[in-house]
Amino acid sequence: MIVLDTSIIIDYFRGVETTYNLIDEESEIAVTTINCSQIIRGDTFQLQAPLSC
């Protein structure tokens, strides 16, 4: 399971695009980053293909 590191989501509710780190829960290593203003706090992803926005 890969989840958003919500600690760095600071500007979502002001509509500011922020870079979100996707963190692998088991290794706690950032596996990729995305920049998507539409992603909401706490969203989770299963990465089966490259993410794009």
UniProtKB/Swiss-Prot annotation:
- Provenance organism: Archaeoglobus fulgidus (strain ATCC 49558 / DSM 4304 / JCM 9628 / NBRC 100126 / VC-16)
Q: What is this protein called?
A: Uncharacterized protein AF_1480
